[in-house]
Amino acid sequence: MNKNMKITGAGWTTSPLFIPAQKDAAIGFIGSLNYVPSIDTNENKMFKDSYLKNFGRVPSEFAVQGYDAGKVIIEAVKSLSGNITDKSQLTEAINNISVVGPRGPLTIDRNSNNVIQNIYIFEVIKGDTMPSLKILDTIEAVKDPGTGCSL
């Protein structure tokens, strides 16, 4: 990094998966992701603590995507009282689910079948033992333009 110029790019460049290898070289990077471990909510604290206990490392954006996908599916199945034989009913149930997970609120966009979610702008800063991701701004309820999947 350069003291006079910040480096920016895709958030996964400094994902929690890569920070242990990058160490202090990542400090100063600015990026955006749908999840950073420093989100200050009870849902994220519980998720992060449990993940760290079970896997010995800080969760990444990929870990939270799997967790939230499972949460959406569970809620959709519950809403159908476990009867998931009709795929169109299950799809409709998923489209009607709104959950709050470690990364914040999310729903499925009926037009694109993509997730409507917060995006976090962050900077990598020096942490106690490892660099961490400090949230600079939150862009709420980001929606895909609708040019994607047409399931």
Please report, for each region that a protein language model flagged, where it lies by residue.
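Extracytosolic ligand-binding ectodomains
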Residues: 1-151
